Amino acid sequence: NHLTENLYKLLKDYFGFKETDRRTLVGFYSTPDYNPLLDYLGTDMRFLHLRPVDSFIMNEIGPSFQPFIDEWGLKHELLSGYYNLGGEPLAHLERQSDIEKYPWPDPYKAERITGLREEAEQLYNFTEYSLVGHRPVYGNAWEMSRFLLGMEKTLLMTVKEKILFEAFFDKMSNVLDGFYDVFLNEVGPFIQIIEMAEDLGTNNGPMFNPKFYKEVMWRYHRRTIEKIKKKAPHVKIMLHCDGAIRRFIPDLIDAGFDILNPVESDLIGMDPAELKRDFGKDLVFMGGVDVKKILTKGNRRDIQREIR
């Protein structure tokens, strides 16, 4: 659901189409507004994005691009055509007062919604696309914990400092709920789906003990979903979650997620037919094509078989 600038250019050149009106970046991982490509390919979904704040507006990617710090305190460095997030600005976290002293972003800055309602109304009234509210930040509370604290510290805190980690998770969730609130104020009547994002798995299984998800993370996901549903009852909740996450799926359903994206079909427990058989009555699976082998190395017949 997002393309880096370099990949976008390769696809545009390959298909040979020209753009007439394009915003360079949407402020998320330095990605382009690629609706012209979606139009060309005839896809049936369009994503709506919160706007970047002034300090997070960037120009075309090029040799002169320098690392920068975003409003979360995260450092963006250009690596092989995309910006890698680093810096771990809360790696020093030791006590609850550190959480409160941190300069958290203000979700309600006016520039985040400039022209957003008008764009949503235009797509809703004059197209037949399914409209999706793109995740308003890089990810939800677990994803952002890993960015702000660092992977190692995050995982250690779930075991050794559960009380402090839960205080951090609560604060993180509250800030993110503000982003969803301001987003839905503008696009809620027009979208059919809104996205959340948490990578809970590795290629081999869960990233952490699934019991921790149920004991701590579940209720925060549930709380966010309840707030979204209260403001926009018709909206379906899509979770972007990479990895071999089958063991999480019953709890994800219980938390209120309606759609899971992607399905990494080559990983343990992620066979699309088995997932549909076991969970299909409660969950929609989106994106089940093997992009690692079939799309890169398969022939046309392989791809057709995979899609079916």
Predicted regions and their residues:
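Segments that shape or occlude catalytic/ligand-binding pockets
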Residues: 10-55
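Acidic/polar N-terminal loop/beta-strand segments that form early-domain functional surfaces
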Residues: 1-2, 43-53, 71, 134
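Short, well-ordered loop/turn elements at secondary-structure boundaries
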Residues: 42, 62, 126-127
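Active-site loop segments of alpha/beta catalytic cores
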Residues: 1-20, 69, 78, 96-308
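A contiguous, low-structure linker/loop signature
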Residues: 53-105
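N-terminal low-complexity, intrinsically disordered patches enriched in charged
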Residues: 25, 82, 296-297
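Short, glycine/charge-rich beta-strand/loop segments that flank catalytic centers
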Residues: 48-62, 108, 135-139
